[in-house]
């Protein structure tokens, strides 16, 4: 463990301004804000392999914030986190427990602190910066490549001079590196139906009790535990069916992604003028036909990807919707951004847009980041998004049911739990001037 790591462990109390001075000194002398305990250990023990975990100074701080810290100490710690983030500390790097700094704060019930808010804000900035970098196909150089560990050994905090304390321009690129580290290899992603839309549409699906899954891999495409969330979505869509308390003459509802048909059944029970269902997967389309959806008088099935089908509707300009719901599988946030561009063209001025909000829902801090991103991105399209916060059923959060022969986890026979957050943020978006 280096002096930087020891500093972030708060071995000396009280935590005062000297901590900030020493932290700045280490960073200004070339120790990266992402320098990990694992890298220091490997160097000390002459291990050449790349470490598989990344316990950074930010992890150490979040793990060692004293439970009895005074307000003054919390203020110093908050400044230290701010400095580390300015120098490129990775907000979503994971330690030996697969925890990000934000995960540690949540586990320690410190997610109502300014420190946690800083971590979330760093995630938002990183995502926005990553988008901009991706536009220009820029190469990112990792700031821990070719580290001179011997140089770090000679750095002593007490040798700081006034001149060395002058502000320097910090680097902010390592958050992008964090994003890259959590990605799978591209060749794996291409064959993964949960990550690649083209692969998913060629993958056989299976309807089983309470779930729609990929037949061979058992990826959870949709599950019945989502029913209450779908009911909220349906209720939101029909809020766009009235103007000043008067029901619209023509109530048109669009759902993108049929899945198990949970929300579409709810929509149909409310008897809209027209119910549009956009679905691309051949097995799901076969289910639609088998269950008689093609014969329902007020239902229009749009066969194919929404990217093609909705652009046709937009070009024709003959139908506009009181409510639009989006819940597809194997698409990404970039796809949602493309959808926003179409939504504003086919949504009635008093209409409501909603979606199944599973963005980053396998890690709470990432879920918080995407909540803020959605608000910002929809605002750019003239939509204001409000979130209703509800608690997710306890059974959904139980990956395993211990000491029980009767109960089963909802995730039994599912490849991976795609939801681990205790809270669901239900989105409801309208045009700002409504």
From Swiss-Prot:
InterPro entries: Arginine_N-MeTrfase_2 (IPR017408), RMT2/GAMT_Mtase (IPR051038), RMT2_dom (IPR026480), SAM-dependent_MTases_sf (IPR029063)
Regions of compositional bias (Basic and acidic residues) in chain numbering: 178-193
Cellular location(s): Cytoplasm; Nucleus
Keywords: Cytoplasm, Methyltransferase, Nucleus, S-adenosyl-L-methionine, Transferase
Disulfide bonds: none
Cellular component aspect of the GO annotation: cytoplasm; nucleus
Region (Disordered): 155-198
Residues annotated for S-adenosyl-L-methionine binding in this entry: 200, 230, 258-263, 279-281, 306-307, 327
EC number(s) per entry: 2.1.1.-
PANTHER family from the UniProt entry: GUANIDINOACETATE N-METHYLTRANSFERASE
Record text on subunit structure and interactions: Monomer.
Protein name: Protein arginine N-methyltransferase 2
């Amino acid at each position: 463990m280096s002096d930087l790591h020891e500093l972030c462990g708060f071995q000396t109390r009280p935590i005062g301004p000297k901590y900030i001075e020493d932290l700045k000194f280490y960073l200004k002398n070339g120790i990266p804000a992402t320098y990990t305990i694992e890298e220091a250990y490997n160097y000390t023990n002459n291990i050449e392999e790349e470490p598989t975990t990344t316990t950074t100074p930010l992890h150490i701080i979040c793990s060692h914030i004293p439970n009895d810290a005074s307000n003054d100490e919390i203020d110093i710690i908050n400044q230290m986190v701010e400095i580390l983030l300015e120098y490129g500390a990775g907000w979503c790097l994971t330690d030996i427990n697969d925890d990000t700094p934000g995960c540690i704060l949540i586990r320690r019930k410190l997610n109502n602190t300014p420190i946690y808010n800083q971590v979330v804000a760093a995630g938002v900035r990183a995502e926005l910066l990553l988008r901009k970098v991706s536009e220009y196909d820029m190469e990112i150089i990792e700031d821990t490549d070719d580290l001179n560990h011997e140089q770090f050994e000679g750095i002593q905090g007490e040798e700081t001079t006034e001149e060395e304390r002058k502000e320097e321009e910090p680097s902010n690129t390592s958050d992008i590196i964090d994003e890259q580290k959590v990605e799978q290899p591209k060749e794996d992603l291409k064959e993964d139906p949960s990550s690649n839309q083209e692969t998913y549409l060629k993958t056989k699906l299976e309807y089983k009790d309470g779930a729609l899954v990929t037949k061979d891999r058992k990826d959870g495409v949709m599950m019945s535990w989502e029913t209450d969330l779908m009911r909220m979505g349906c209720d939101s869509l029909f809020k766009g069916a009235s103007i000043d308390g008067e029901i619209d003459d023509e109530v048109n509802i669009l759902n993108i992604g049929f899945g198990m048909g949970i929300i579409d059944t709810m929509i149909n029970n409310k008897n809209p003028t027209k119910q549009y269902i956009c679905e691309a997967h051949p097995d799901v389309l076969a289910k639609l036909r088998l269950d008689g959806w093609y014969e329902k008088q007020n239902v229009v099935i749009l066969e194919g990807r929404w990217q093609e089908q909705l652009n046709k509707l937009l070009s024709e300009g003959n139908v506009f919707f009181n409510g639009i719901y989006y819940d597809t599988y194997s698409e990404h946030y970039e796809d949602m951004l493309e959808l926003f561009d179409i939504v504003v063209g086919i949504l009635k001025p008093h209409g409501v847009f909603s979606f199944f909000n599973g963005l980053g829902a396998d890690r709470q801090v990432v879920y918080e980041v995407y909540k803020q991103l959605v608000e910002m991105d929809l605002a750019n399209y003239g939509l204001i998004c409000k979130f209703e916060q509800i608690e997710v059923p306890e059974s959904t959060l139980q990956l395993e049911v211990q000491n029980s022969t009767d109960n089963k986890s909802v995730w039994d026979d599912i490849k991976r739990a795609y939801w681990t957050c205790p809270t669901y943020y239900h989105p409801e978006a309208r045009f700002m001037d409504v």
